[in-house]
């Protein structure tokens, strides 16, 4: 049975900026003329092994046009790959700051900031570090990381040293259809037309016939030698002054990543330190909820971003 191809309702413009010595790729929907003080640019941050184009379905589902910018993180999509063989989390926060400088200047007005998964983690840290630069904050399943014990540090460092001896690799796919098949196998809730469209955004030709490779640096798979500093993250969460919208899928399962080391309940306790947080569950949806339920996400976003709330004073 044939499936009609997905056709974006709102076309994205592709462009690049140079920040921190790297050529960083962005997508833009709408026009800056659509912004106002109470309707600033919405900046979207994708997750690990994802790309900026992943937000296309949510942008298409908006009832009204708005100015949206999405960033390909370093080593993903069309952004440049750094020379280093290991990725450290603060690098993403630094990239966001300097990319925003390039887009809006250092004296910029507050933006609306959304992140999914890893991008949600970055968004939370950034909003706690630069609370005066974020008007509204949206986190789509950026659960953070499990607590690590200091006793884990020696073994973690040793495993990282061992990993450095072997180049990381991402397997190629015979064609773009195989990429789409992998997407639907990983996420059975993903519609076939969306999977086919995403496959063309997530992968690129290798030069070997129809073969495709994911647009991601394989070094993203290498572990960090450092324990997660959960208490540091929580201090930043406490400094978030923007209203926060948290959205999760009803079928997402954090045990897939961390077993019994970290639960949704523990993360929800962490959210309690954020002064102004709304929480929503959408479904049926898994971790890729922006693919599964883009219409629900768009509706929640538009309602949340249009709310009128007085700003909270930054804690001293």
Q: Predicted segments — roles?
A:
Residues 140-173:
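A catalytic-pocket lid/entrance helix-loop region that shapes and gates access to the active site
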Residues 1-42, 63-66, 104-107, 161-162, ...:
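Alpha/beta-hydrolase fold catalytic core
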Residues 241-285:
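Conserved loop-alpha-helix segment in the C-terminal half of the alpha/beta-hydrolase fold
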Residues 109-152:
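Conserved hydrolase catalytic core segment
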Residues 25-81:
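Conserved HGGG/HGGXW glycine-rich cap/lid loop of the alpha/beta-hydrolase fold
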Residues 169-227:
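Conserved alpha/beta-hydrolase catalytic His-Asp/Glu region
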Residues 93-109:
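Conserved acidic catalytic loop of the alpha/beta-hydrolase fold
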Residues 282-294:
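Catalytic histidine-centered segment of alpha/beta-hydrolase-like enzymes
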């Amino acid at each position: 049975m044939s499936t009609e191809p997905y056709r974006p309702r709102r076309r994205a413009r592709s462009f690049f900026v140079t920040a921190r010595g790297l050529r960083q790729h962005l997508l833009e929907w709408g026009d800056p003329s659509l912004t106002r003080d109470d309707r600033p640019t919405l900046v979207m941050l994708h997750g690990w092994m994802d790309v900026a184009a992943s937000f296309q379905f949510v942008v298409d589902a908006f009832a009204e046009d708005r100015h949206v910018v999405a960033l390909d993180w370093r080593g993903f999509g069309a952004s440049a790959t750094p020379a280093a063989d290991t990725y450290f989390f603060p690098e993403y926060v630094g990239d966001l700051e300097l990319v925003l400088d390039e887009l809006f200047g250092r004296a910029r007005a507050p933006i609306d900031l959304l992140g999914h998964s890893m991008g949600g983690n970055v968004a939370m840290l950034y909003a706690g570090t630069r609370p005066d630069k974020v008007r509204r904050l949206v986190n789509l399943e950026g659960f953070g990381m499990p607590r690590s014990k200091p006793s884990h540090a020696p073994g973690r460092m040793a495993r990282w040293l061992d990993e450095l001896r072997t180049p990381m690799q991402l397997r190629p796919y015979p064609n773009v259809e195989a990429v789409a098949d992998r997407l639907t196998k990983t996420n059975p809730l993903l519609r076939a037309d969306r999977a086919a469209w995403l496959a063309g955004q997530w992968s690129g030709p290798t030069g070997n016939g129809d073969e495709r490779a994911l647009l991601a640096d394989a070094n993203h798979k290498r572990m960090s030698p450092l324990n997660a500093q959960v208490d540091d993250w929580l201090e930043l969460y406490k400094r978030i002054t923007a209203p926060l919208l948290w959205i999760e899928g009803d079928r997402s399962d954090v045990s897939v990543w961390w077993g019994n080391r970290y639960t949704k309940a523990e993360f929800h306790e962490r959210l309690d330190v954020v002064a102004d947080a709304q929480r929503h569950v959408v479904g049926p949806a898994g971790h890729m909820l922006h693919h599964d339920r883009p219409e629900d996400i768009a509706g929640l976003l538009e309602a949340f971003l249009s709310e009128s709330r007085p700003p909270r004073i930054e804690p001293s």
